[in-house]
Swiss-Prot record:
One of its GO terms (cellular component) is plasma membrane. It comes from the Eukaryota. Residues 59-77, 138-164, 233-281, 327-328 are cytoplasmic. Coiled coil: none annotated. The gene is GNRHR. Receptor for gonadotropin releasing hormone (GnRH) that mediates the action of GnRH to stimulate the secretion of the gonadotropic hormones luteinizing hormone (LH) and follicle-stimulating hormone (FSH). This receptor mediates its action by association with G-proteins that activate a phosphatidylinositol-calcium second messenger system. It comes from Ovis aries (Sheep). GO terms for molecular function: gonadotropin-releasing hormone receptor activity; peptide binding. This is Gonadotropin-releasing hormone receptor. It is found in: Cell membrane.
């Protein structure tokens, strides 16, 4: 490295994306028992998520066909359709990639696929997170500013398009920073070891720290804050309305009135936020810990490490159950 960074700093930012392994010559990774369990659980969740999300898409399609041809899907069902597509994309890209990578341990697919799959992986993680933000914003506006939403029928389509666009743009740096490295075992037991990593792609160590923090913020912190704020506004608005007219509480027994629909919306958005928080918090806690202390890999047991990473794969499995229960 042609800079003034210390060796420790260089080591920190020349790390592998697959954070479950540590690449150091002479100590090359192997597929452990806990790794085999992780692979098994990963492919099991892959099957569950694929079945759940595909089933919901088919249910939406059948629901549409039963309606009159002149009617379109409601705005909420359009949003749920795009969230399902985003979850399905994450399922079909991230889970098989993680499972196969843990089986092979090293990277055999070459430089091009290293870059392309790294891009698709992050893109498929951005998309569902941003789509959850769109749903939260749309439901919040529908309750707090219903007239403004009705007067701007294209707002939902704009937010959906923006979510997909930002996902593709924010994942773009992956095409540049990821590449192949080749390591040799000091013991001479292996002829070579290839891995797809961000090895020394950043001029200085803090550049990677900034990129990691930006990615973490866009994938987790910002979406979570927006969902919490939107839910708080929905609760505040409904509480104020019911306080002004307590008799509306009795109307909630009917399935054909606005208060009941609003309460169902509140329950669904809260369930989304809860699932998002529960599933992704362990994953990012481990990731942040690794950013600030790469040696934590040697202190945290291998089973705990794999267990925390598996939490993230639960989210695309839970989402179709949530919106299937509350919307259809």
């Amino acid at each position: 490295m042609a800079n003034g960074d210390s060796p420790d700093q260089n080591e920190n930012h020349c790390s592998a994306i697959n954070s479950s392994i540590l690449l150091t010559p002479g100590s090359l990774p192997t597929l452990t028992l806990s790794g085999k369990i992780r692979v098994t659980v990963t492919f099991f969740l892959f099957l569950l998520s694929t079945i759940f999300n595909t089933s919901f898409l088919l249910k939406l399609q059948n629901w549409t066909q039963r309606k009159e041809k002149r009617k379109k899907l409601s705005k909420m069902k359009v949003l749920l359709k795009h969230l399902t597509l985003a979850n399905l994309l994450e399922t079909l890209i991230v889970m098989p990639l993680d499972g196969m990578w843990n089986i092979t341990v090293q990277w055999y697919a070459g430089e091009l696929l290293c870059k392309v799959l790294s891009y698709l992986k992050l893109f498929s993680m951005y998309a569902p997170a941003f789509m959850m933000v769109v749903i939260s914003l749309d439901r919040s506006l529908a309750i707090t500013r219903p007239l403004a939403v009705k007067s701007n029928s294209k707002l939902g389509q704009f937010m959906i398009g923006l979510a997909w666009l930002l996902s593709s743009i924010f994942a773009g740096p992956q095409l540049y920073i990821f590449g192949m490295i080749h390591l040799a075992d000091d013991s001479g037991q292996t002829e070579g070891f290839s891995q797809c990593v961000t090895h020394c792609s950043f001029p200085q160590w803090w550049h990677q720290a900034f990129y990691n923090f930006f990615t973490f913020s866009c994938l987790f912190i910002i979406p979570l804050l927006i969902m919490l704020i939107c839910n708080a506004k929905i609760i505040f608005t409904l509480t104020r309305v019911l306080h002004q007219d307590p008799h509306k509480l009795q109307l909630n027994q009917s399935k054909n009135n606005i208060p009941q629909a609003r309460l169902r919306t509140l329950k669904m958005t809260v369930a989304f936020a809860t699932s998002f928080t529960v599933c992704w918090t362990p994953y990012y806690v481990l990731g942040i810990w690794y950013w600030f202390d790469p040696d934590m890999v040697n202190r945290v047991s291998d089973p705990v490490n794999h267990f925390f990473f598996l939490f993230a794969f639960l989210n695309p499995c839970f989402d179709p159950l949530i919106y299937g229960y509350f919307s259809l």
